[in-house]
């Protein structure tokens, strides 16, 4: 077996397909040989063993001392105890029943009105997962209309509230936060709650929490008698929460088949428990990542789905892959700086954007093409200019143009996009991430960099409070003086805070030149 990208034998030998879900995986255009695949067999013995331990309930997130159980969500029978098993089954049933009753108008607001919309408040995986679900699967005029607050940009919040306007009384406000203490969803929730109550709308009639039992958010929702609380277990991480209530509730509210989505993920999970590398799609996919990046993440992953409904999938994978695999240390404490950078948009748009560099520029990437074989039922106007055939031609042409320049790629083909195949596709990448992490000996389930960022942000927020307190005294302050009065602060973040607070704000008098921060003198306006 050679490394020839255009070898038909290599393509046939490494093409994976499963007829239950009609998904193909082709890694033949990655630079590897048969001998290299064989060389990973011993490593994969350890990989399969570690995944088996994880699924059995081992403490896999060492930093947080918790289990990692998103695979149980798709097959409760493998959960480590009957309590967790029964909890999963109950949660799935509750979500399906709730969605059905909302869509049938059995559950209504306090004014006996049927719900029409959802304003979803969630950060990271708590926002990206639901967005992927609705963008990929929602049919026109079916189910509730979804809007998202996935950032605390004040313009975004104002825009979404303005768009909903008259529909606010019939909007469900879904707040997702496992701990209930994450600042962004908490701040967004408080702003939206005040706005809603100012419009004389009863918040608790429309509010839903997705959170961990006994969290801050859980207690608040209980105390205020919110419409519903759905469980988000301690053992589910944000980036792998899409088969929990975080992803299942949107499915139910757009009238999609919750059980089929779970079944697709479960089928893929089972296929990736096969211990023969060539018969295991996640083993093949993670091996392709490993060989392309020489086991040290030398190449970026460029995700190109050739279907608009999967455009969000690139962003979804960005978090799943980068937050899981971007690690400074391996499990032995050695500095390794592992990771795979992910970006992408959609084909064929990207052929007119950055594919030029992919073919002729620096060779620091591999592509993941995602192809769909189906076509809309209403295609009578297509005539001889069938867009499906053109799209397929563009994909194959781009793939061929890249391989002719020895640029590496992976191709995943789905017969159609539905609950079953989307569930399977997501599970494939989740499993591949787990496998790759084991191959390079890192923990895929912690996020020390994210936690460090949260800690640093909390310090800045504390500085902001202290700056405000100082300026409220009515005295004049330089950046240097403020810095000296706030313990452990430095001048640069204080300047950022002052500029954010005071620039263009008539509440403050400013002397000096903004291009020379040392000259800036600030005083609270006494008017």
Swiss-Prot record:
GO molecular function: carbohydrate derivative binding; glucose-6-phosphate isomerase activity; monosaccharide binding
Residues at the active site: 323, 352, 454
Principal location listed in the UniProt entry: cytoplasm
Protein name stated in the entry: Glucose-6-phosphate isomerase
CDD domains xrefs: SIS_PGI_1, SIS_PGI_2
InterPro entries noted in UniProt: G6P_Isomerase, Phosphoglucose_isomerase_CS, SIS_dom_sf, SIS_PGI_1, SIS_PGI_2
Entry's localization field: Cytoplasm
Membrane-crossing residue ranges in chain numbering: none
Family: Belongs to the GPI family.
GO cellular component, one term: cytosol
EC number: 5.3.1.9
Keywords annotated in UniProt: Cytoplasm, Gluconeogenesis, Glycolysis, Isomerase
Keyword Isomerase appears in the UniProt entry: yes
Reaction catalysis annotation: alpha-D-glucose 6-phosphate = beta-D-fructose 6-phosphate
Annotated pathway: Carbohydrate biosynthesis; gluconeogenesis; Carbohydrate degradation; glycolysis; D-glyceraldehyde 3-phosphate and glycerone phosphate from D-glucose: step 2/4
Broad class of enzyme this protein falls into: isomerase
Role according to the record: Catalyzes the reversible isomerization of glucose-6-phosphate to fructose-6-phosphate.
GO biological process, one term: gluconeogenesis
Highest taxon of source: Bacteria
Keyword tRNA processing listed: no
